[in-house]
Amino acid sequence: MSKNSELYFFIGLRIKQARTNTFGHRLMTQTELAKALNVSFQQIQKYEKATNKISIEKLDKIAQYTKKPLAYFLPHTVVDSTTISG
């Protein structure tokens, strides 16, 4: 599995986890989340299975809707100490 595939697999898993609690009880359905994002429930399925890549904008909307920080959906990464200035 490529790094890119692993990333989207991780994101998909986190989307599903955000919809359900650790005991598997439903917090929201794919349909409910889809309506909030103005996409089909099939699109949510594809995000969760990493069949389709999700944009950062959609991921941010999922984070807002599920009340999770955006970082929750991304694997832990370490950024070097180099300062980037604009």
Where do the language-model regions lie?
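Helix-turn-helix/winged-helix DNA-binding modules
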Residues: 25, 51-54, 65
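Recognition helix of helix-turn-helix/homeodomain-like DNA-binding domains
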Residues: 37-54
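Conserved hydrophobic/aromatic packing and binding residues within compact polymer-binding modules
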Residues: 15, 33-34, 44-47, 73
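Short basic helix-loop element that most often maps to the first helix and adjoining turn
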Residues: 13-32, 36
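A detector for short, charged/polar N-terminal pre-domain segments
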Residues: 1-11
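Helix-turn-helix DNA-binding elements, focusing on the entry/boundary residues of the two helices
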Residues: 30, 41, 56-59
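Short, charged recognition helix plus adjacent turn
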Residues: 1-2, 74-86
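DNA major-groove recognition helix of helix-turn-helix/homeodomain DNA-binding modules
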Residues: 57-72
